[in-house]
UniProtKB/Swiss-Prot annotation:
Cofactor requirements of the protein: NAD(+)
Residues spanning the membrane: none
Natural source organism: Bacteroides fragilis (strain ATCC 25285 / DSM 2151 / CCUG 4856 / JCM 11019 / LMG 10263 / NCTC 9343 / Onslow / VPI 2553 / EN-2)
Signal sequence, renumbered to the chain: none
Protein name listed in UniProt: Alpha-N-acetylgalactosaminidase
Listed EC numbers: 3.2.1.49
Length: 425
């Protein structure tokens, strides 16, 4: 609930941090990869690690020692993360745990004077989204969701093109998370599966789109959401569930507990969103169908079109009936290459790092903190993109009725016209 003295944090900036002191909560598959990435980033110091499974903590500490870094303090147990957040020598806490613990950990961290970087989605309910917003506004701490797809080179190029008016007026965008994860959902943690199978458990209990941010984040940036426009309402529809059951029958037998289990989450979810200014957004989610990976990333405007999947495609007036190919496509991608790609992305290639968009995201986050700049993604992005999880489920369960999307800025979106991720300064 908003207090009388509480104001928005659009454009929030803090004094520069010469050295950014980091702590990590969660050292499973994603957490360890994040930790290893930050060994490549200048201007950071890893102060503390927290992991509920002590074996994972020991392995993570060993990674740092073998890389020539001082061993950070370790915390474990159910409340270890709280003790770590209560320290006064940490600037930024990374939260790389299961979905359901993201918000309480972020809120506690901000209440103890820490900036937070949260794995996606940042929250699972609208109530949790409001908790993040209210806490960030009251504490004046940064709260960034680690939506790495916003730093994809093609996404950044189309963002740059949109900001320069190349597509004309944007009328419609599309995003998705289509990724066959059946083997991971059923795998033990030792074989790359989720801790305690939390991903599969969510599929049993919920429907809608539980993971909207990979597709939604980049296209919301193109539409300048909460910086001159905002998402108004959505309608959502899910197909029947068949993929999980079919996979379980094939791999565990028709009479296995896995095959007999009932799953509420439909195989394909499609959510349509309209903005206050009349722009339309389509977001899809499917992780149980044998098909190629896709995030779609479609941009439609009055002067042109772009789409990343299944193959990168750009078409512009006056010859928009045919997409640019070969050298012509390369030239337009080079002409509108985003500054982040030109600097941090080039550095990632030079150093032969495995995931360019992660590296660009990491570098940009630390760059902003060390230079006292607003972050590229704020708490309102985290709330707006994450709230689709609960709201899409509400729509699906009620015959695809329209569901209103809250204005987490409480009207400040009308006053703010900041062009995000357009400069390095």
């Amino acid at each position: 609930m908003k207090t009388p003295s509480q104001t928005h944090v659009l454009g929030l900036a803090h004094p520069p941090l010469p050295m950014v002191r980091l702590a990590f909560i969660g050292l499973g598959n994603r957490g360890v990869l994040t930790l290893q990435r930050y060994l490549q980033i200048e201007g950071v110091e890893i102060k503390a690690l927290c992991e509920i499974r002590e074996g994972n903590l020991v392995k993570a500490q060993k990674i740092l020692r073998e890389a020539g870094y001082p061993q950070p303090d370790g915390y474990t147990g159910p409340d270890g993360w709280k003790r770590m957040c209560e320290r006064d020598d940490i600037d930024l806490v990374f939260i790389c745990t299961d979905w359901l613990t993201h918000t309480p950990m972020a809120v506690y961290s901000m209440e103890h004077g820490k900036h937070v970087a949260i794995e996606v989605p940042a929250a699972m309910t609208v109530e949790e989204c409001w908790k993040l917003v209210d806490t960030a506004e009251k504490t004046r701490q940064h709260c960034m969701m680690l939506e790495n797809c916003c730093y994809d080179p093609f996404a950044l190029t189309t963002l740059n093109m949109a900001q320069q008016g190349v597509f004309g007026e944007i009328t419609h965008v599309e995003g998705a998370y289509i990724h066959d994860l059946r083997s991971i959902y059923f795998a033990d943690e030792s074989k790359g599966g989720f801790h305690n199978h939390w991903g599969k458990k969510y599929s049993i209990e919920h429907t809608g789109n539980p993971y909207p941010t990979h597709g939604l984040g980049p296209v919301c940036q193109i539409l300048n959401i909460h910086r001159g426009d905002r998402m108004n309402y959505l309608v959502s529809l899910s197909s029947l569930q068949a993929g999980m059951t079919e996979y379980a029958r094939k791999n565990f037998g028709a009479d296995s507990p896995e095959a007999r289990q009932k799953y509420l989450l439909g195989d394909m979810n499609t959510t349509l969103i309209q903005t206050v200014k009349g722009k339309s957004i389509m977001i899809q989610y499917n992780v149980v169908t044998p098909r190629p990976y896709s995030r779609l990333h479609t941009v439609c405007g009055t002067k042109g079109f772009a789409q990343k999947y299944p193959v990168p495609s750009i078409a512009l007036e006056p010859d928009a009936g045919s997409p640019l190919e070969g050298k012509a496509l390369e030239e337009i991608m080079e002409r509108y290459k985003h500054p982040f790609t030109a600097t941090f992305g080039t550095e990632a290639h030079r150093r032969n790092l495995p995931n360019e968009m992660n590296y660009v995201m990491d570098c940009r986050l630390i760059y902003c903190l060390r230079n006292g700049l607003p972050l590229d993604m704020d708490v309102y992005d985290a709330a707006e993109w994450s709230c689709i999880t609960e709201l899409s489920e509400q729509s699906v369960l009620n015959g695809s009725i329209p569901v209103e999307i809250p204005d987490f800025t409480r009207g400040a979106w009308k006053k703010c016209h900041i062009s995000r991720t357009s400069d390095l300064y």
